[in-house]
Amino acid sequence: MKLVEVKHPLVKHKLGVMREAEIDTKKFRELATEIGSLLTYEATSDLETEKVTINSWNGPVEIDRIKGKKVTVVPILRAGLGMMDGVLEHVPSARISVVGIYRNEETLKPVPYFQKLASDLEERLAIVVDPMLATGGSMIATLDLLKAKGCKHIKVLVLVAAPEGIKALEAAHPDIELYCASIDSHLNEQGYIIPGLGDAGDKIFGTK
């Protein structure tokens, strides 16, 4: 599995602000979008381009254009919605495929409850977004679902990843790419990432 921890100063600064205990919902939401955008920039750096000729203000000119790669953004509900707009800033024509999976707080196991996927997944690059990669259970279940529907090319974007989740994801899906803003220390007994961000979904949606 390709693992990239994006260490750009802007990413580190924005993530540091997100860790503040008293951050408000508006700021947390804005920063999730901004880091999602920066991770997308990194994750799409290998997209192939081709030369095409267009009519410019000064006549025909040859330009670079992304070569026929269709994209679907896959936010894992609900927290993944907080990163979705950051991806769409760069690929505004992407289809949106939604997967609903929540983590049982007692067993820490993923529980699927909703899916609405693009019809031609086998032809698309899937960019899966979720702020936290903790145990990896929800992400693994999502990727299992995408692959069962024919998706062959998957990149995962998360804000914060725990070593335990990275290990589990690599064991289950060694062929995918994972981009994160930080690899944090560990999971606590409740399955939360330390130091982490707290409950990212609650902070994005202003709920408790």
Curated annotation (Swiss-Prot):
The keyword Ribosomal protein does not apply. Keywords: Allosteric enzyme, Glycosyltransferase, GTP-binding, Magnesium, Nucleotide-binding, Transferase. Pathway: Pyrimidine metabolism; UMP biosynthesis via salvage pathway; UMP from uracil: step 1/1. This is Uracil phosphoribosyltransferase. One of its GO terms (biological process) is uracil salvage. GO terms for molecular function: GTP binding; magnesium ion binding; uracil phosphoribosyltransferase activity. Binds 1 Mg(2+) ion per subunit. The magnesium is bound as Mg-PRPP. Uracil binds at residues 193, 198-200. InterPro entries: PRibTrfase_dom (IPR000836), PRTase-like (IPR029057), Upp_B (IPR034332), UPRTase/APRTase (IPR050054), Ura_phspho_trans (IPR005765). The gene is upp. The lineage of its organism: Bacteria, Pseudomonadati, Pseudomonadota, Gammaproteobacteria, Pasteurellales. Pfam families: UPRTase. The keyword Transferase applies. It is an enzyme of class 2 (transferase). It comes from Haemophilus influenzae (strain 86-028NP). Its EC number is 2.4.2.9. 5-phospho-alpha-D-ribose 1-diphosphate binds at residues 78, 103, 130-138, 199. It catalyses: UMP + diphosphate = 5-phospho-alpha-D-ribose 1-diphosphate + uracil. Its cofactor is Mg(2+). It comes from the Bacteria. Allosterically activated by GTP. Belongs to the UPRTase family. Catalyzes the conversion of uracil and 5-phospho-alpha-D-ribose 1-diphosphate (PRPP) to UMP and diphosphate.
